[in-house]
């Protein structure tokens, strides 16, 4: 049964959703993204977030209280490839570090419409290479939500093409797998999904692709090869725009004989694992269990 808290969050999302002038909003983001991201001081103090000086891309770190850590997490945040990290991201990552003995790295990759997909991918590469130097690839997790989930999968495909080691786990939360949003079943999700603006997503995807075909696998990783990648886990809600493509991805994996953890949460909205709801607590427990498990896929993924 769906929690009251999740219904309340959905109500808030519906209540606060605004009609957008897509062209005007993209111009606002273009202007905003010319400036560096500034982590609010209150979040920095509350979650003990530090900034690394090792990389050309601004990269923030959260550490568990127990050191040395067991896992390194490269987290690629969502936001339609045009938005910077939100408060919910930091709250989720703080909870992750408390439940998983880990250090989380959050590179604030370049955003559209100012930058395109290769700018984002290449900005993340030095961070991943640094994690490889710290320990074994099996202890590395690449995780992302929404656009960050799509970028996580595309980045893993990029690593495979370059012959670099795969991470131990790829955790995709409500991933944006196909920026074309051409799956006809997506239209059926519009009445159920209160959060993203479909028209804005379509234009953001075009801006992220630039002059490259939007079906290029590094933009829309559902069109890429997945047999040579690390262990893949997908979390998705049944009230999401991205549900049809997540199901398509699961079918594709099954046909290719690629085992994945695929977890659907009934009546959950976009990126539900980052919200303060009981379903998110359960999803986080599952994420930690997946990362810590030596068996794959997990047999018992009951909610």
Language-model features, listed with the residues they occupy:
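Alpha/beta-hydrolase superfamily serine-hydrolase fold, recognizing
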Residues: 54-60, 64-303
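A glycine/proline-hinged amphipathic helix-loop "lid/cap" segment
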Residues: 1-67, 299-303
């Amino acid at each position: 049964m769906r929690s009251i808290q999740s219904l309340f969050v959905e109500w808030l999302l519906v209540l606060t959703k605004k009609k957008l002038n897509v062209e005007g909003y993209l111009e606002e983001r273009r202007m905003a993204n010319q400036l560096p991201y500034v982590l609010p001081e209150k979040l920095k103090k509350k979650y003990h977030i530090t900034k690394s000086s090792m990389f050309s891309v601004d990269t923030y770190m959260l550490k568990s209280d127990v050191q040395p850590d067991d896992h390194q997490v490269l987290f690629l945040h969502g936001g339609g490839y045009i938005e910077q990290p939100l408060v919910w991201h930091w709250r989720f990552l703080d909870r992750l570090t408390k439940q998983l003995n880990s250090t989380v790295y959050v590179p604030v990759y370049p955003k559209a419409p100012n930058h395109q997909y290769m700018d984002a991918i290449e900005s993340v590469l030095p961070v991943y290479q640094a994690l490889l130097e710290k320990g074994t690839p099996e202890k590395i997790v690449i995780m992302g939500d929404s656009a960050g989930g799509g970028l996580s999968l595309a980045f893993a495909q990029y690593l495979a093409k370059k012959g670099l080691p795969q991470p131990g786990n790829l955790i995709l939360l409500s991933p944006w797998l196909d920026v074309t949003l051409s799956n006809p079943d997506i239209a059926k999700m519009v009445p159920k999904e209160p959060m993203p603006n479909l028209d804005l997503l379509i234009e953001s995807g075009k801006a992220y692709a630039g002059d490259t075909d939007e079906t290029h696998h590094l933009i829309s990783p559902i069109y890429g090869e997945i047999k040579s990648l690390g262990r893949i886990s997908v979390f998705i809600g049944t009230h999401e725009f991205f549900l049809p493509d997540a199901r398509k991805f699961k079918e594709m994996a099954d046909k290719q004989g690629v085992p994945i953890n695929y977890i659907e949460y009934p009546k959950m909205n976009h990126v539900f694992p980052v919200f303060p709801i009981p379903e998110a607590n359960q999803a986080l427990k599952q994420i930690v269990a997946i990362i810590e498990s030596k068996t794959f896929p997990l047999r018992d993924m009951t909610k």
